[in-house]
Amino acid sequence: MKIALQTTPFNRNDLFEAAGFEVVEGRCRTEADLIALLQDADGAQVTTMPLTSRAVMKACPKLKVLSRMGVGVDSIDLDAATEMGILACNVPGVNTAEVADHAVAMLLALTRRIVDTVRTTREGAWGSDGRLTVEYLQTVRRIAAHTVGIIGFGDIGRAFATRIRGFGPARIIAYDPYVEQTTADLYGVQLVSLEELLTNADYISIHTSLTQETRHLINEETLSLMKPTALLVNTSRGPVIDGAALARSLEKKEIEAAALDVTEAEPVDSQDPLLSLPNVIVTPHLAGFSPTFLEECSIRQAENIIWALSGKAPHGLANPEVIKTIAVMRSTTPGRWEGIPDFSTALAV
């Protein structure tokens, strides 16, 4: 069987070859490039761009398994994958610590004005400069005695809560309609509505996945609910925030500042208004990275494909409903799954 890999520095061709698979590799900038690479493949490692769309999957009749690095699978059309009997695999939990650490670092960069003061120090200002000292003292803040809000209370949101608790906030509140209060209690967190979180939190950190429900969850209306002194951090997915609305809100000082590891369009356009605002920090979607993450994730991403094509459960399955689709295929028109070991028990969800 053939495995197609979009070229990255982290591909583990050796694992596929040791398992007896043929490996092809290529760089893909367009949908046509991706189709050309995947059209004869049984399994594929795909990246964020180009999108693995319905058209791509339809053009690849042998494709059975897609595997993405990390947790996010918003670059894959999950509905199409499920309809066509294609597993969409991810690697949950592998970079939870890295993203939670980065979110805390970004919040501290805002509360302590780290980026501003590094710049002004390089320009010659120092603590003895009265102007700098007064300005700094008027705007720098502590986390203690403030309310921290978390949007999305999955693994990363919980890891963030654990870390931020050490700074002594007055309260930690969270919004996640899929989590029970008994779970939040384990972290000393109070679940609230989105409106209550936005109106009460001094610091807000976003850790939700990108779905139709959460796309532009933070928009002109929800931004208007926040305190004018609110600080907003996003290390989840860019389109959770309406970027244009956020830029307007920051420019008008309707909220105080934002720190973003992700943007609505990536890579971010050099002319994006957010980049020109002094009250915004942007990092290039690297919150989840570390040498440990890359090593673990590259192995698990490959194992997802090897295991699924061998009848074993992958590390993560983003479209568990596909199991029923494949079961029907096996009993009627086996198609792409003909000859592959039955994994219905191993993948039962």
Locate predicted features.
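Rossmann-like dinucleotide/phosphate-binding beta-alpha-beta segment
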Residues: M1, A18-A19, V134-P228, R336-V349
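N-terminal glycine-/charge-rich "phosphate-binding" loop or analogous flexible N-terminal tail
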Residues: M1-A41, L309, T325-V349
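Short, well-ordered coil/turn residues at beta-beta hairpins
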Residues: Q6, V46-T47, M69, M106, ...
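Short beta->alpha connector loops at strand-helix junctions that form conserved
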Residues: G26-R27, T47, M69-G70, I86-A97, ...
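Short acidic/histidine-rich motifs immediately flanking catalytic phosphotransfer sites
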Residues: L38-G43, P61-L63, T199-I204, K227-T229
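Rossmann-fold NAD(P) dinucleotide-binding segment
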Residues: L51-L63, L78-A80, E213-L232, G243
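Phosphate-binding beta-alpha-beta segment of Rossmann-like dinucleotide-binding domains, i.e.
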Residues: M84, P92-T147, A159-T162, F167
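Rossmann-like dinucleotide-binding domain for NAD(H)/NADP(H)
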Residues: A88, E220, T229-V349
